[in-house]
Amino acid sequence: MVVLTSTERLVETNGVTLRVYEAGEPGAPVVLLAHGFPELAYSWRHQIPVIAQAGYHVLAPDQRGYGGSDRPDAVEAYDIHALTGDLVGLLDDVGAQQAIFIGHDWGAMVVWHTAVLHPERVRAAAGLSVPPIPRARSRPTERWREKFGDDFYMLRFQEPGLADAEMEADVAATMSGMFAGLLTGRAPLPEWISADEFEHYVTEFSRTGFTGALNWYRSYDRNWESTPQLADTKINVPALFVGGTADPVGPTMNPARARELVAGPYTEQWVEGAGHWVQQERPDEVNRILLAFLTEVEKS
């Protein structure tokens, strides 16, 4: 089992308490790692020590709704302003003005939004599996219904309690299905995760449930309604997108449109044969890509 070679502590910020894993020297440039759905800071277990050893101060929180962090009851507590505010608050906690933000899946969406909602705090931004995409012209749930129909999983996630109960009925089946690239149903564990590593996820989500995580999806429309200014806002810092060529998620988000949002230096890297959980599936390749990006950012 790979363990987190870092210090764990609780940080009070932005009205919540977050469990944060921290590695590297205080005062060094900060790299903040934001996990996705349904993950934990543990999903960065292969990146935290490598980035810290490269000379960075690494912060990897369980984001609100997950793991050892607070799980507010109100759906409104999970909007994009709260989520980006949490990450900015972690910079305040360590006395850093800026950080290089790296996110996976939903964490990537939070990172891209941090770059436009709090540009003064972002030195550079990287997203794994979810590219920077411009603001939609219509409400997300309306667009999904038109494009995918009423049975689309993100629409099913909108109903409080429904998906929560289904996923919590058998957490091991939920997580194995997710990691195998399915939305439901037990599946054999992929080779990239050990039984002990898998059990870490099962134990945590058995304790916390999935409601906090699903509330991120239930905030999609609210996020769209509260950010009309993003239609004319660009990401001006260095940006990186890393995708897996076997990931069913990334291509559906049309990474070719990234340049509509990113005005600064932009790099796109694909990991051949990798699926959605790219930083866990192919840690060595992803680490090489991330370290090269960090080096380029430091030069700029």
Predicted regions: what they are:
Residues 265-300:
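Catalytic active-site module of serine/aspartate enzymes centered on a nucleophile-bearing elbow/loop
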Residues 21-70:
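Conserved HGGG/HGGXW glycine-rich cap/lid loop of the alpha/beta-hydrolase fold
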Residues 63, 130, 273:
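Active-site loop/turn elements of alpha/beta-hydrolase fold enzymes
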Residues 37, 41-44, 106, 112, ...:
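Signature tryptophan residues that serve as conserved aromatic anchors
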